[in-house]
Amino acid sequence: MEKNRKKQIVVLSIALVCIFILVFSLFHKSATKDSANPPLTNVLTDSISQIVSACPGEIGVAVIVNNRDTVKVNNKSVYPMMSVFKVHQALALCNDFDNKGISLDTLVNINRDKLDPKTWSPMLKDYSGPVISLTVRDLLRYTLTQSDNNASNLMFKDMVNVAQTDSFIATLIPRSSFQIAYTEEEMSADHNKAYSNYTSPLGAAMLMNRLFTEGLIDDEKQSFIKNTLKECKTGVDRIAAPLLDKEGVVIAHKTGSGYVNENGVLAAHNDVAYICLPNNISYTLAVFVKDFKGNKSQASQYVAHISAVVYSLLMQTSVKS
Protein backbone atom coordinates (compact mmCIF):
# COMPACT_ATOMS: atom_id res chain seq x y z
CA MET A 1 0.00 0.00 0.00
CA GLU A 2 2.82 2.36 1.02
CA LYS A 3 4.77 1.46 -2.15
CA ASN A 4 1.75 2.32 -4.36
CA ARG A 5 1.35 5.68 -2.63
CA LYS A 6 5.02 6.54 -3.17
CA LYS A 7 4.72 5.46 -6.78
CA GLN A 8 1.69 7.74 -7.28
CA ILE A 9 3.57 10.67 -5.74
CA VAL A 10 6.53 10.09 -8.05
CA VAL A 11 4.26 9.89 -11.12
CA LEU A 12 2.41 13.05 -10.04
CA SER A 13 5.68 14.90 -9.46
CA ILE A 14 6.95 13.93 -12.89
CA ALA A 15 3.68 15.06 -14.45
CA LEU A 16 3.87 18.43 -12.69
CA VAL A 17 7.46 18.92 -13.84
CA CYS A 18 6.45 18.11 -17.42
CA ILE A 19 3.57 20.58 -17.26
CA PHE A 20 5.88 23.26 -15.86
CA ILE A 21 8.42 22.66 -18.63
CA LEU A 22 5.68 22.83 -21.28
CA VAL A 23 4.22 26.07 -19.92
CA PHE A 24 7.67 27.63 -19.59
CA SER A 25 8.51 26.61 -23.17
CA LEU A 26 5.32 28.15 -24.54
CA PHE A 27 5.85 31.34 -22.55
CA HIS A 28 9.45 31.59 -23.74
CA LYS A 29 8.42 31.14 -27.37
CA SER A 30 5.72 33.79 -26.98
CA ALA A 31 8.14 36.22 -25.35
CA THR A 32 10.73 35.58 -28.05
CA LYS A 33 8.13 36.14 -30.75
CA ASP A 34 6.95 39.39 -29.15
CA SER A 35 10.56 40.54 -28.85
CA ALA A 36 11.20 39.77 -32.50
CA ASN A 37 7.95 41.51 -33.54
CA PRO A 38 7.43 44.52 -31.26
CA PRO A 39 4.14 46.44 -31.46
CA LEU A 40 3.74 48.80 -34.41
CA THR A 41 3.51 51.80 -32.10
CA ASN A 42 6.93 50.97 -30.63
CA VAL A 43 8.50 50.59 -34.06
CA LEU A 44 6.99 53.87 -35.24
CA THR A 45 8.12 55.69 -32.10
CA ASP A 46 11.69 54.38 -32.37
CA SER A 47 11.96 55.09 -36.10
CA ILE A 48 10.59 58.63 -35.81
CA SER A 49 12.72 59.36 -32.75
CA GLN A 50 15.89 58.49 -34.68
CA ILE A 51 15.03 61.05 -37.36
CA VAL A 52 14.01 63.70 -34.85
CA SER A 53 17.19 63.30 -32.79
CA ALA A 54 19.34 64.44 -35.72
CA CYS A 55 17.34 67.61 -36.36
CA PRO A 56 18.97 71.04 -35.77
CA GLY A 57 15.79 72.25 -34.14
CA GLU A 58 12.81 70.66 -32.42
CA ILE A 59 10.36 68.33 -34.13
CA GLY A 60 7.12 67.09 -32.64
CA VAL A 61 5.20 64.26 -34.26
CA ALA A 62 1.88 62.54 -33.69
CA VAL A 63 0.43 59.58 -35.60
CA ILE A 64 -3.06 58.11 -35.26
CA VAL A 65 -3.51 54.84 -37.16
CA ASN A 66 -6.99 53.59 -38.07
CA ASN A 67 -8.52 55.97 -35.53
CA ARG A 68 -6.97 53.86 -32.76
CA ASP A 69 -3.21 53.36 -32.36
CA THR A 70 -1.45 56.55 -31.31
CA VAL A 71 2.21 57.52 -31.45
CA LYS A 72 3.69 60.67 -29.90
CA VAL A 73 7.22 62.04 -30.14
CA ASN A 74 8.11 65.31 -28.37
CA ASN A 75 4.45 65.94 -27.68
CA LYS A 76 5.07 67.66 -24.33
CA SER A 77 6.19 70.79 -26.17
CA VAL A 78 3.87 73.11 -28.07
CA TYR A 79 4.64 74.46 -31.53
CA PRO A 80 3.64 77.57 -33.51
CA MET A 81 0.79 76.51 -35.80
CA MET A 82 1.20 79.21 -38.43
CA SER A 83 -1.33 78.54 -41.23
CA VAL A 84 -2.32 75.13 -39.89
CA PHE A 85 -4.83 77.13 -37.85
CA LYS A 86 -6.79 77.79 -41.04
CA VAL A 87 -8.31 74.33 -40.59
CA HIS A 88 -9.47 75.41 -37.13
CA GLN A 89 -10.78 78.63 -38.64
CA ALA A 90 -12.73 76.81 -41.35
CA LEU A 91 -14.41 74.50 -38.83
CA ALA A 92 -15.35 77.36 -36.51
CA LEU A 93 -16.72 79.48 -39.34
CA CYS A 94 -18.77 76.64 -40.79
CA ASN A 95 -20.16 75.81 -37.35
CA ASP A 96 -21.17 79.46 -36.86
CA PHE A 97 -22.81 79.56 -40.28
CA ASP A 98 -24.69 76.35 -39.40
CA ASN A 99 -26.07 77.95 -36.25
CA LYS A 100 -27.10 81.11 -38.10
CA GLY A 101 -28.45 79.36 -41.20
CA ILE A 102 -26.03 81.19 -43.50
CA SER A 103 -24.90 79.61 -46.76
CA LEU A 104 -21.25 79.31 -47.75
CA ASP A 105 -22.35 80.61 -51.14
CA THR A 106 -23.10 84.03 -49.65
CA LEU A 107 -21.43 86.68 -51.80
CA VAL A 108 -18.88 89.03 -50.24
CA ASN A 109 -17.71 92.27 -51.86
CA ILE A 110 -14.14 93.09 -50.85
CA ASN A 111 -12.51 96.48 -51.35
CA ARG A 112 -9.04 95.87 -52.68
CA ASP A 113 -7.57 98.78 -50.73
CA LYS A 114 -8.47 97.00 -47.47
CA LEU A 115 -6.23 94.05 -48.33
CA ASP A 116 -2.52 93.75 -47.58
CA PRO A 117 -0.52 93.77 -50.84
CA LYS A 118 2.62 92.55 -49.04
CA THR A 119 1.28 89.34 -47.50
CA TRP A 120 0.94 85.93 -49.17
CA SER A 121 -2.29 86.22 -51.16
CA PRO A 122 -2.91 84.33 -54.42
CA MET A 123 -6.44 85.78 -54.32
CA LEU A 124 -5.05 89.28 -54.75
CA LYS A 125 -3.10 88.17 -57.82
CA ASP A 126 -6.12 86.44 -59.36
CA TYR A 127 -8.33 89.55 -59.24
CA SER A 128 -7.18 92.94 -60.46
CA GLY A 129 -10.29 95.09 -59.97
CA PRO A 130 -10.89 97.59 -57.13
CA VAL A 131 -13.68 95.38 -55.76
CA ILE A 132 -13.34 91.61 -55.49
CA SER A 133 -16.61 89.64 -55.35
CA LEU A 134 -16.27 86.14 -53.93
CA THR A 135 -18.41 83.69 -52.00
CA VAL A 136 -17.43 82.60 -48.51
CA ARG A 137 -16.84 79.17 -50.03
CA ASP A 138 -14.28 80.77 -52.38
CA LEU A 139 -12.55 82.47 -49.45
CA LEU A 140 -12.31 79.18 -47.57
CA ARG A 141 -10.96 77.48 -50.66
CA TYR A 142 -8.24 80.11 -50.94
CA THR A 143 -7.24 79.66 -47.29
CA LEU A 144 -7.27 75.85 -47.31
CA THR A 145 -5.70 75.12 -50.69
CA GLN A 146 -3.33 78.08 -51.07
CA SER A 147 -3.11 79.38 -47.49
CA ASP A 148 -4.21 82.88 -48.50
CA ASN A 149 -3.57 85.31 -45.65
CA ASN A 150 -5.85 88.11 -46.85
CA ALA A 151 -8.79 85.71 -47.08
CA SER A 152 -8.08 84.44 -43.57
CA ASN A 153 -7.73 87.94 -42.11
CA LEU A 154 -10.97 89.03 -43.74
CA MET A 155 -12.96 86.10 -42.33
CA PHE A 156 -11.50 86.62 -38.85
CA LYS A 157 -12.31 90.33 -39.00
CA ASP A 158 -15.81 90.24 -40.51
CA MET A 159 -17.25 86.77 -39.82
CA VAL A 160 -15.93 84.62 -36.96
CA ASN A 161 -13.18 86.15 -34.85
CA VAL A 162 -10.15 84.58 -33.21
CA ALA A 163 -11.76 84.24 -29.77
CA GLN A 164 -14.83 82.51 -31.21
CA THR A 165 -12.60 80.16 -33.18
CA ASP A 166 -10.51 79.32 -30.13
CA SER A 167 -13.63 78.65 -28.04
CA PHE A 168 -15.23 76.35 -30.61
CA ILE A 169 -12.10 74.28 -31.16
CA ALA A 170 -11.87 73.81 -27.38
CA THR A 171 -15.10 71.80 -27.66
CA LEU A 172 -13.39 69.39 -30.07
CA ILE A 173 -9.90 68.83 -28.64
CA PRO A 174 -8.35 69.32 -25.18
CA ARG A 175 -8.05 72.95 -24.12
CA SER A 176 -4.45 72.40 -23.03
CA SER A 177 -3.39 71.16 -26.46
CA PHE A 178 -3.75 74.42 -28.39
CA GLN A 179 -4.37 78.15 -28.38
CA ILE A 180 -5.43 80.60 -31.09
CA ALA A 181 -4.84 84.20 -30.06
CA TYR A 182 -3.83 86.16 -33.17
CA THR A 183 -4.61 86.58 -36.87
CA GLU A 184 -2.13 86.33 -39.72
CA GLU A 185 -2.11 90.14 -39.84
CA GLU A 186 -1.15 90.41 -36.17
CA MET A 187 1.56 87.77 -36.50
CA SER A 188 2.96 89.57 -39.52
CA ALA A 189 3.26 92.79 -37.49
CA ASP A 190 4.93 90.99 -34.56
CA HIS A 191 6.53 87.66 -35.41
CA ASN A 192 6.80 86.65 -31.75
CA LYS A 193 3.01 86.44 -31.60
CA ALA A 194 3.22 83.31 -33.75
CA TYR A 195 4.34 81.43 -30.65
CA SER A 196 1.02 82.29 -28.98
CA ASN A 197 -0.88 80.46 -31.73
CA TYR A 198 0.32 77.05 -30.66
CA THR A 199 -0.58 73.38 -30.66
CA SER A 200 0.76 70.08 -29.48
CA PRO A 201 1.32 67.59 -32.31
CA LEU A 202 -1.36 65.32 -30.86
CA GLY A 203 -3.83 68.19 -30.55
CA ALA A 204 -3.51 68.95 -34.26
CA ALA A 205 -3.64 65.27 -35.18
CA MET A 206 -6.76 64.75 -33.06
CA LEU A 207 -8.57 67.61 -34.78
CA MET A 208 -7.67 66.40 -38.27
CA ASN A 209 -8.56 62.84 -37.34
CA ARG A 210 -11.96 63.84 -35.95
CA LEU A 211 -12.61 65.94 -39.04
CA PHE A 212 -12.22 62.86 -41.24
CA THR A 213 -13.76 60.19 -39.00
CA GLU A 214 -16.61 61.89 -37.13
CA GLY A 215 -19.47 64.29 -37.78
CA LEU A 216 -18.50 67.62 -36.24
CA ILE A 217 -20.60 70.10 -38.20
CA ASP A 218 -23.17 70.08 -41.01
CA ASP A 219 -22.40 67.18 -43.38
CA GLU A 220 -22.23 69.30 -46.52
CA LYS A 221 -19.90 71.86 -44.99
CA GLN A 222 -17.69 69.22 -43.41
CA SER A 223 -17.44 67.35 -46.71
CA PHE A 224 -16.48 70.61 -48.38
CA ILE A 225 -13.61 71.15 -45.93
CA LYS A 226 -12.39 67.57 -46.33
CA ASN A 227 -12.51 67.63 -50.11
CA THR A 228 -10.85 71.04 -50.24
CA LEU A 229 -7.95 69.84 -48.07
CA LYS A 230 -7.38 67.09 -50.64
CA GLU A 231 -6.70 69.87 -53.14
CA CYS A 232 -4.07 71.61 -50.99
CA LYS A 233 -1.36 73.05 -53.24
CA THR A 234 1.15 74.18 -50.62
CA GLY A 235 3.98 72.18 -49.08
CA VAL A 236 4.03 69.29 -51.55
CA ASP A 237 7.65 68.75 -50.50
CA ARG A 238 6.62 67.79 -46.95
CA ILE A 239 4.26 64.96 -45.93
CA ALA A 240 3.00 64.54 -49.49
CA ALA A 241 6.47 64.27 -51.07
CA PRO A 242 7.04 60.49 -50.70
CA LEU A 243 3.38 59.70 -51.44
CA LEU A 244 2.81 61.53 -54.72
CA ASP A 245 3.92 58.60 -56.89
CA LYS A 246 2.16 55.94 -54.80
CA GLU A 247 -0.87 54.42 -56.51
CA GLY A 248 -4.14 54.54 -54.61
CA VAL A 249 -2.93 56.90 -51.86
CA VAL A 250 -5.25 59.79 -51.00
CA ILE A 251 -3.88 62.66 -48.94
CA ALA A 252 -5.61 65.69 -47.44
CA HIS A 253 -3.38 68.11 -45.59
CA LYS A 254 -2.69 71.64 -44.37
CA THR A 255 0.70 73.27 -44.03
CA GLY A 256 2.03 76.09 -41.92
CA SER A 257 5.22 78.05 -42.59
CA GLY A 258 6.97 80.36 -40.16
CA TYR A 259 9.24 83.36 -40.28
CA VAL A 260 13.03 83.39 -40.37
CA ASN A 261 14.49 85.57 -37.62
CA GLU A 262 17.59 87.79 -37.69
CA ASN A 263 19.74 84.81 -36.67
CA GLY A 264 18.56 82.73 -39.60
CA VAL A 265 16.40 80.47 -37.43
CA LEU A 266 13.16 79.21 -38.98
CA ALA A 267 10.35 79.60 -36.44
CA ALA A 268 8.07 76.89 -37.82
CA HIS A 269 7.63 74.45 -40.70
CA ASN A 270 4.55 72.25 -40.32
CA ASP A 271 2.22 69.83 -42.03
CA VAL A 272 -0.82 67.91 -40.79
CA ALA A 273 -2.38 65.24 -43.00
CA TYR A 274 -5.06 62.58 -43.16
CA ILE A 275 -3.95 59.77 -45.45
CA CYS A 276 -5.85 56.80 -46.88
CA LEU A 277 -3.88 53.85 -48.25
CA PRO A 278 -5.23 51.35 -50.80
CA ASN A 279 -5.06 48.57 -48.17
CA ASN A 280 -7.81 50.11 -45.99
CA ILE A 281 -5.31 51.61 -43.55
CA SER A 282 -5.89 55.28 -42.79
CA TYR A 283 -3.79 57.48 -40.57
CA THR A 284 -3.33 61.02 -39.40
CA LEU A 285 0.21 62.40 -39.36
CA ALA A 286 1.14 65.71 -37.74
CA VAL A 287 4.71 67.01 -38.00
CA PHE A 288 5.71 70.31 -36.41
CA VAL A 289 9.20 71.77 -36.74
CA LYS A 290 10.20 74.79 -34.65
CA ASP A 291 13.32 76.90 -34.17
CA PHE A 292 15.04 75.13 -37.06
CA LYS A 293 18.63 76.13 -37.77
CA GLY A 294 18.51 75.66 -41.50
CA ASN A 295 16.47 76.62 -44.55
CA LYS A 296 12.92 75.67 -45.51
CA SER A 297 14.04 73.03 -48.00
CA GLN A 298 16.07 71.27 -45.31
CA ALA A 299 13.17 71.42 -42.86
CA SER A 300 10.88 69.94 -45.52
CA GLN A 301 13.29 67.03 -45.95
CA TYR A 302 12.89 66.09 -42.29
CA VAL A 303 9.10 66.19 -42.60
CA ALA A 304 9.19 64.14 -45.82
CA HIS A 305 11.58 61.60 -44.27
CA ILE A 306 9.21 61.05 -41.34
CA SER A 307 6.29 60.69 -43.74
CA ALA A 308 8.19 58.14 -45.85
CA VAL A 309 9.09 56.03 -42.82
CA VAL A 310 5.53 56.03 -41.47
CA TYR A 311 4.14 55.08 -44.88
CA SER A 312 6.69 52.28 -45.34
CA LEU A 313 6.05 50.76 -41.91
CA LEU A 314 2.28 50.86 -42.35
CA MET A 315 2.54 49.20 -45.76
CA GLN A 316 4.78 46.47 -44.29
CA THR A 317 2.28 45.91 -41.51
CA SER A 318 -0.47 45.53 -44.08
CA VAL A 319 1.51 42.94 -46.05
CA LYS A 320 2.28 40.89 -42.91
CA SER A 321 -1.33 40.92 -41.76
UniProtKB/Swiss-Prot annotation:
Signal in keyword set: yes
GO BP field: beta-lactam antibiotic catabolic process; response to antibiotic
UniProt xrefs under Pfam families: Beta-lactamase2 (PF13354)
PANTHER family for the chain: BETA-LACTAMASE, BETA-LACTAMASE-TYPE TRANSPEPTIDASE FOLD CONTAINING PROTEIN
Family per similarity comment: Belongs to the class-A beta-lactamase family.
Further comment: The class A beta-lactamase family has a specific amino-acid numbering system, sometimes called Ambler or ABL numbering and often misspelt as Amber. A multiple sequence alignment was used to derive a consensus sequence and then the consensus was numbered taking into account insertions and deletions. This allows use of identical numbers, e.g. for active site residues, despite differences in protein length. UniProt always uses natural numbering of residues, hence there appear to be differences in numbering between this entry and some papers.
UniProt name for this protein: Beta-lactamase
This protein's encoding gene: cfxA
